Amino acid sequence: MVLMGVVLPLCMTALPARADLTLPVTSPAARFSPATWAGDAGRGGAVSRRTWNNGAWCVWHWSTPSPHPTARLQITNQTPGSAVSYFLDGALTDDVPVPASGGIPIAGLAAPGPHTLTVYTRNSPQTDRWRGTNAYTVTGLTLDDGAKPTPAPPLRHWVLIVGDSITEGIQADDGRDSSLCDYAFLVGQGLNAAGFDYTVSACGYSGWVRPGDAQGDVPAYLPLLGVQRWNMIDADTRLLDSRGHLSAYGGIGQEPAAILLNYGVNECLNHSDKAAMRDSVISVLTALRRAAPRTEITVLVPPGLADTRIYPNGPAYITALHAAVAAYQAAHPDDRKTVLVDLGPDVARALGSPAYGGGVHPHAAGHAYLAPLILQAVLSRIP
């Protein structure tokens, strides 16, 4: 402003800087799927959570007064080709690439009020996952100024689903990889509706004695020699608590209500020694029972294995699985919480039909056909 030839400064009130809120991974508003995430300090730490498991999830709850809310999930993966899918207040955004930096802006926020974001690790290349080179890392959720966290519901009784490429959703999206199209996800939604949480620990190429990932970097579930996977989340993080029990987050008293084991396909495809597989099954069941004394354990005969059009040697491996579980039960007659479930040859032939995929990996319709059968098998065992 100019007055009598003198330039006077304009008096202006500075606008306050925008102060976005970032919820850390330790926020009460956040919850991570049990038994599948490692932290920056063992199972915990205040900085980050990471997982290589497709099908793992995290959920965030908050409320905002803003008519134009924003949210950005602080997630990265250094390996190209990985993706997540998320549900915002029930609406699905599918197949979102995970960047090497910068996180993912959440689409669809359009109104004030309470919001819930559930993020699923959808797919990643089957390589370098065990040592964290190919892992999703989450450091928080950044929200608009004025947003406030709201508490996430506590962990409920939970179910651990273990398996191979079929369980992690390879080719499940009608030829494309997606953990949201596989039976494990669908069984998980049924478990949620029945009042349970769930988690998926699955790796392609793996089995009772077969290592996982294309180059074999993920250990077999329990080989007779070498590194085991049953009691680890990744190469550096144990799945057990201080007592040696399976634990959702590392605390005592967090054992799963049930475990479903779906292995044997890769042993069959690779002509693995059936006696070695049998011994591994017995060792797995013995170890799991020691680490989860009251948990319902179900060994599932891989549902397609009886179809000799796809698995010429399938019946021999089915026989080996039956024999292994029978041998364990004979040695542990008081353990009535460990069973084998065989859905039978009709289910196998259905999965082998072209409409359901017609091969080793079912398509979405095949997984949808399979899911209620497996869900019933799991729920029928839980008191």
Residue ranges and their predicted role:
Residues 81-92:
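Short, surface-exposed beta-strand/strand-loop-strand elements in extracellular ectodomains
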Residues 69-73, 102-134:
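Short, well-structured beta-strand segments within conserved domains
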Residues 260-269, 284-318:
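Active-site segments of SGNH/GDSL-like serine hydrolases
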Residues 168, 217-278, 303-305:
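Oxyanion-hole/transition-state-stabilizing segment in secreted/luminal serine hydrolases
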Residues 65-80:
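A short beta-strand element within beta-rich, extracytoplasmic domains
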Residues 18-60:
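Glycan-recognition and processing domains
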Residues 115, 140-214:
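Serine-esterase "nucleophile elbow" of acetyl-processing enzymes
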Residues 216, 303-383:
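Catalytic His-Asp segment of secreted/periplasmic serine-dependent ester chemistry enzymes
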